[in-house]
Curated annotation (Swiss-Prot):
It catalyses: ATP + (deoxyribonucleotide)n-3'-hydroxyl + 5'-phospho-(deoxyribonucleotide)m = (deoxyribonucleotide)n+m + AMP + diphosphate. DNA ligase that seals nicks in double-stranded DNA during DNA replication, DNA recombination and DNA repair. Its EC number is 6.5.1.1. Belongs to the ATP-dependent DNA ligase family. The gene is lig. InterPro entries: ATP-dep_DNA_ligase, DNA_ligae_ATP-dep_bac/arc, DNA_ligase_ATP-dep, DNA_ligase_ATP-dep_C, DNA_ligase_ATP-dep_cent, DNA_ligase_ATP-dep_CS, DNA_ligase_ATP-dep_N, DNA_ligase_N_sf. CDD domains: Adenylation_DNA_ligase_Arch_LigB (cd07901). The keyword DNA damage applies. GO terms for biological process: cell division; DNA biosynthetic process; DNA recombination; DNA repair; DNA replication. The active site is at 212 (n6-amp-lysine intermediate). Its cofactor is Mg(2+). Keywords: ATP-binding, Cell cycle, Cell division, DNA damage, DNA recombination, DNA repair, DNA replication, Ligase, Magnesium, Metal-binding, Nucleotide-binding. This is Probable DNA ligase. One of its GO terms (molecular function) is ATP binding. It comes from Nocardia farcinica (strain IFM 10152).
Length: 523
């Protein structure tokens, strides 16, 4: 298959708002791909690389200035092979070797192919063909139910692997996917709850009420002496968090998969700012730290060996596997019992089936301790990997949403010369496209204004005199007092008193909240 076929399909997907048309175009391309081409093609269409990170940052890529090829002759296999070579480069002279490989690739690429490669390698390839959309295309190409593809993907954590199985072996191959210790799965996500009282009533009081920590999500796998720690986005950070590895090694079990959060604490035992915890994740992967321009407030700090105060403390809230037994489909009550049996004091504090008054006091106590609020979880619900559902609800003193930045307006007054007023959007789960729900410049510090002005042009899709419009690639956490019906925006709702809390570099665009979630906050 020619690389140009992938580029043309990507452009066609970007050019239409019809989800049906997007899926059809992607499925047609997948059917045409050879077996060995499926993994890279699926990865690229999802805006990723089969090899993961390959050490090519923005400065390296923009330094490659080669005239484009006139004819489209590059093949998918050739591009993927060069990515393999780039991923293997290390040691002395690695910078020059990467430049040689990139120059070879760029020389063989046409202008549209060069543009695609630049956006792919800088993580800016967002075309509406996010993983959920590509998963639908895989199902269509393989003629299997999309739910089977989604479940297999949740368990494999890798859509290219899932696609290969679907197109080679159909439904039977997808049914073979199981939770595998050592292979991360997509984490279960929570939906915003209207209030503590309503969340408890919805589940008839059969709930676990837990502290909602302002930490970083982790998933820990142990199989005998082999231990791995993964982030929310399934990135392996094992080498950078030795204190977590040592703790898990001491647990009284043979095999276990744990879900939880980790955070840095002050000497008084209070949580440090989220950005400080995230800085440890950056140092857990120096290559990643070099490639990613993190928002202000996310400093790259020395590793734990030289910064004792930034030791990470884990708090586990779910057990997905224990000593040979998978627990994904077990109710939370059963998973919680297994969790307490294996991690003991390292389980997150919780009240089980509390009275409303006790839950309210617990809420106040969580806030006083410096936490974000509470999680209310149904004790009867299974672990819905990769999904954001009502069986987990997050309760905060003010509502927060994770939204996509769709654009920014040039500021005036003290903000003159800076990209300021943000255009905010939620995901439409039916089309995969963002839906604008409001604007805000509230909460933007001088440092964030400067960062936005430098960073946003990397994500630019268009501009006019007043506004720079962005591809929906950046996730920002927004606090709000509520939502209201509004004919001004296409989704029919608008945010009330929205303000920026922080950017979320730990979240991908398909983990942003949906327009349905926003509408669910209507009074």
């Amino acid at each position: 298959m020619l690389f140009a076929d992938v580029v043309r399909t990507s452009e066609a997907v970007r050019a239409t708002r019809s989800r049906k048309t997007k899926v059809a175009a992607l499925a047609e391309l997948l059917r045409a791909a050879e077996s060995a081409e499926l993994a890279p093609v699926v990865a690229w269409l999802s805006g990723e690389l089969r090899q993961g990170r390959i050490g090519t940052g923005w400065r390296t890529l923009t330094g490659v200035r080669v005239p484009p090829a006139l004819d489209a002759a590059l093949e998918v296999a050739t591009v993927d092979a060069i990515f393999d070579e780039l991923a293997a480069v290390s040691g002395a002279g690695s910078g020059n070797r990467r430049k040689e490989l990139l120059t070879r690739l760029w020389s063989a690429a046409t202008e549209p192919e060069q543009e695609f490669l630049l956006r792919l390698l800088t993580g800016e390839l967002r075309q509406g063909a996010l993983t959920a959309l590509v998963a639908e295309a895989v199902a269509a190409a393989a003629d299997v139910p999309v739910e089977q593809v989604r479940r297999a993907y949740m368990l494999s954590g890798q859509l290219p692997v899932t696609a290969e199985a679907a197109l080679r072996g159909g439904a039977a191959a997808l049914a073979e996917f199981r939770l595998e210790v050592g292979r991360p799965i997509q984490p279960m996500l929570a939906a915003p709850g209207a209030s503590l009282e309503e969340a408890m009533t919805e589940f008839g009081g059969e709930v676990s009420v837990e502290h909602k920590l302002d930490g970083a999500r982790i998933q820990v796998h142990r199989d005998g002496d082999r231990i791995a720690v993964f982030t929310r986005t399934l990135r392996d950070i094992t080498a950078g968090v030795p204190e977590l590895v040592e703790l898990v090694a001491r647990l009284d079990c043979t095999s276990v998969v744990l879900d939880g959060e980790t955070l840095a604490l002050t000497d008084a035992g209070r949580p440090r700012p989220f950005q400080e915890t995230m800085s440890r994740f950056a140092t857990a992967d120096p290559a990643r730290a070099a490639e990613v321009d993190l928002p202000p407030g996310t400093p790259v700090v020395p590793p734990v060996s030289s910064t004792r105060e930034l030791l990470l403390h884990p708090y586990f809230f779910d057990c997905l596997h224990l000593d040979g037994r998978d627990l994904l489909d077990a109710p939370l009550s059963e998973r919680r019992a297994a969790l307490l049996a294996v991690v003991g004091e390292h389980a997150i504090p919780a009240l089980i089936r509390p009275e409303p008054e006790a839950a309210a006091e617990y809420f106040d106590g969580a806030l006083a301790a410096g936490h974000e609020g509470l999680m209310v979880k149904s004790l009867s619900a299974p672990y819905a990997a990769g999904r954001r559902g009502r069986s987990w609800q997050k309760i905060k003193p003010t509502h927060t949403l994770d939204l996509l930045v769709l654009g920014a307006e040039w500021g005036y007054g003290r903000r003159t010369g800076y990209l300021s007023n943000l255009h905010l959007g939620a995901r439409d789960p039916r089309t995969g496209e963002p839906v604008m729900v409001g604007k805000t410049f509230k909460g933007l510090t001088d440092a964030l204004l400067a960062w936005q002005t430098a960073e946003f042009p990397r994500h630019e899709r268009a501009r006019d005199e007043h506004t720079v419009y962005l591809w929906p690639e950046l996730v920002v956490e927004i606090a709000l007092d509520g939502v209201q019906v509004s004919p001004r925006y296409p989704g029919g709702v608008a945010l009330r008193f929205a303000r920026v809390v922080r950017y979320r570099p730990d979240k991908t665009p398909d983990q942003a909240d949906t327009i349905d979630t926003v509408r669910g906050l209507l009074p």
